[in-house]
């Protein structure tokens, strides 16, 4: 079973410009990582009659109880004017023990 470094994984995830409704591949990326460590994953698409389709990742590990559920999100807000950034968005950077996400 593979192991993952938390900082490396966080940097990989941050590189995806996953601005709703475009997930930029982050769902498939995370599903692959979770599948590699034993999860069964499904990417589900939800659409309200007045909205655009939005993808969600459903991942399950095992079938026994008790069950544990974690809910999070993989989308980000639009970065706005790129010229206003000192560190480019979607470019995770660590400088002198400070992180810029």
Set out the residue ranges of the language-model regions.
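N-terminal glycine-rich anion-binding loops that anchor highly charged ligand groups
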Residues: 4
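Acidic active-site catalytic centers that drive phospho-/nucleotidyl reactions
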Residues: 7-9, 23, 75, 97
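Generic N-terminal amphipathic, Lys/Arg-enriched alpha-helix
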Residues: 7-17
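A non-catalytic alpha/beta surface segment that caps or lines the substrate-entry region
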Residues: 19-66, 86-91
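Active-site metal-coordination/substrate-binding segment of hydrolases
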Residues: 67-101
